[in-house]
Amino acid sequence: MKHRLLLLSAVAMLVMTACEKPKMEVYPRCFSVSETTQVFFSPGNLQYDGTTKKYSFAPTQMTVIGGANRNISDTYGGAIDLFGWGTGNNPMMSSTVGTDYATFVDWGSKMDEPGWRTLSFEEWNYLIQKRPNANKLYGSCAIVNIMGGKDFGMVILPDTWDCDTIDVSYSDNFLKHQYDSELWKKMEKAGAVFLPTAGDRMGNSIAISSVGNEGRYWSSTPITDGCAHYIGFGDFVNEESDGTLRSHGRSVRLVKEITSPSQIPAAK
């Protein structure tokens, strides 16, 4: 009888172990976007050069193009960083009709380096709301440069953030959390991501007041014909966007999935 009980106990343990979800390995300077997927972010917002016909990343996480996005056209030779939804194959598209953007072509698929992609809305939502300690790992903030100027945006911290002396708990006020350039360098080296307030474009019109005050970042998720999900923030964080017309020009921040430590970029 005793042996039978021990055998039943062992079988029960095996069944319980088999039913447990495998734990995802947590990598440094990376971000969970689901229970099974970690990513790292590109070093800056996506840009497109009308002369070279090439995509690239902004030179810093704070860099935005601003009002020059209004020049968008098939013949424009300058750079833009506000894109209609899913325009990876036609970044200079400026139609104001949402249904003209019927098919999502990921900008990441057009990068010279493979593997880049756009987060889905579900992944954005998991990153900001559902991962462990989510409300302590993002918030509106200001990066203060050496001249005293302020770059407003949203900071997002990696899963393994361990700089407890730096307050980055959720805030809906840019000025509550201000980081000088030296502190920001340390945060960035530890994996902090900054999404700048690059503004919003519609056709060839851009509200200048939105540049430096509002951030709108596309997801890959459509809603209905002509509309798609995005994440938006200003002196607020609106991670539960109901969506907007696909014809809006919005920011793009690409990611890469991590499956081994060798894929993680070296800390700068």
Labelled PLM ranges:
Residues 15-18:
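C-terminal motif of bacterial Sec signal peptides marking the signal peptidase cleavage site
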Residues 2-8:
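Sec-dependent signal peptide recognition
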Residues 24-268:
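Conserved positions within compact, well-structured domain cores
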Residues 20-22:
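Bacterial signal peptide processing site
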Residues 11-13:
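Repetitive helical segments and hydrophobic/amphipathic motifs
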